[in-house]
Amino acid sequence: MSVFPEGFLWGGALAANQSEGAFREGGKGLTTVDMIPHGEHRMAVKLGLEKRFQLRDDEFYPSHEATDFYHRYKEDIALMAEMGFKVFRTSIAWSRLFPQGDEITPNQQGIAFYRSVFEECKKYGIEPLVTLCHFDVPMHLVTEYGSWRNRKLVEFFSRYARTCFEAFDGLVKYWLTFNEINIMLHSPFSGAGLVFEEGENQDLVKYQAAHHQLVASALATKIAHEVNPQNQVGCMLAGGNFYPYSCKPEDVWAALEKDRENLFFIDVQARGTYPAYSARVFREKGVTINKAPGDDEILKNTVDFVSFSYYASRCASAEMNANNSSAANVVKSLRNPYLQVSDWGWGIDPLGLRITMNMMYDRYQKPLFLVENGLGAKDEFAANGEINDDYRISYLREHIRAMGEAIADGIPLMGYTTWGCIDLVSASTGEMSKRYGFVFVDRDDAGNGTLTRTRKKSFWWYKKVIASNGEDLE
C-alpha cells in the first residue's frame, strides 16, 4: 500500500516567463524577465546592478520565444494528461492581463488565453495550481514607480489578484501569490524588479519592497477567500535548509541565521506577524520598515498552505570561503563534500528534502506542497533516437522516497509538481541546455530549433509512478 494519501496531487510545473514566449502577442506588455539577456550581462541585470529599461538589438532574450507554450499549450497539456497528471502548476503573466500593470480594466485577450489554458486542463481532469507573480513584474511599474519599493504596487497587485480570482473562479482553486518570494534578497531585479542607485542601502530597499510584497500577498489571500471560500492560497519559498559546515558553534549559528534569512518571508505569511528576530536583523542592517496604518492587521490573513521548491540543501559557516562556494538556485552556499553534484554543481541530497519538510512543518503546522523539484541536466539523443535520462529518474526516485518518509513522519503533503516537466528556459542561466523535463523540446541556447516535443525515458517512468500513487518507483 502506498504511503501517499488518496487524492495526492501528482504533476509538474512550468512558468509563464520560461515557457510561453509570444512576449508581444495578445496585448501583452513587457516584463522584467523580457529585459534579461542571455550571456555575460545576465547576472548584473538580475542583481539590479545594471539598468536595462530598453531592449538591445545585439542581445538574445530567451524569454521572448521560450518554448512557445502560448501556441502549443494544447499539445503540452495533452502530454501531461498522457502521464496522468492530477495537477499542473503554471503562472499567469501579470502583463498579459494588465500590460502596464497600473490599468483599471484588464486586457480581455489575456483573460481569454488563460481561461482556455485552464479549461484545457479541466478537460483532462487536471487541477491548475496558479502562481500570480513568477519573476515577471510589468516593466512600466519598474520605470514609472520603482517597482516594489513603491507602496502603489500593493494597490496594483490587489486589483490584478482580484481580477484573476473572479475571472477564473470555478476553474482554479489552488493559488500561490509570489514565486520563491525570498529570492528577491538574492536576485533583486528578477525577484522584485528592483534596480539600485549608487550608494543607497540595498538592504533597506529590499526589505521595504519585501514588506510591500508581504502586505500584497496577505491582501490577495483575503480577497481570494472573499471571492470563493473554497479557494486555497499558498506562499512559496525557495527551500533547502542550511547545514552547519562543522559542529563549531559559530557555524551552527551561521546556519541558523541563513535559514532565518530565507524563512523570514514565510514566517510572516504563515504566522501573520513579523518574527521576533527580525527587529535585531533590521537594526543591524540599518533597516526601518515604513508601515502604513493597518498593515499589521492585514498581515494576519495567513496562507492556507506552505509551498516550496527543493533542489538541494545548503551549507553555512561563520567563515564563508568563496573558493568553496556553490549557488544552488541562486542562494549562495558552501559546497558539501558528502554530496554528489549535478552538471551545474548543485548538491544532490534527498535526505535534505525530508529534513527540510520536517523543519518547515514543525515551524508552521500547515499542509506542505512541494511545487518544484528536479534535476537540470544535459540530455543527448541515443543512436536509436531515444533519450535515456536514467540520471533524472534516479534523482526523482530518491526524492520521492524522501517525500514518502516525510509523510510517514506525520507531515501532511498535498502534492508534488516536478519542475520543468516539459523543457523550458532556465531562470538562473537563460539556457535551454539545462533541461528538467520529461519531454525534450528541440531548442538550443541560441534560440535555434524546431520546438518539436519528444518524450524521454523518464516520461514513461513518471507515468508509472503516478498510476501507482508513488508505489512503483522502479
Can you say where each PLM-predicted feature lies in the sequence?
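Active-site region of glycoside hydrolase catalytic domains
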Residues: 1-57, 100-102, 111-474
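Active-site mouth loops of central-metabolism enzymes
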Residues: 58-72, 149-152
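Internal amphipathic alpha-helical repeat/solenoid segments
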Residues: 65-78, 99, 110
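Catalytic domains of carbohydrate-active enzymes, especially glycoside hydrolases
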Residues: 72-93, 301-306
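A short acidic, glycine/proline-enriched capping/turn motif at secondary-structure boundaries
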Residues: 86, 95-97, 135-137
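Glycine-rich, proline-tolerant flexible connector loops at the mouths of alpha/beta enzymes
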Residues: 92-106
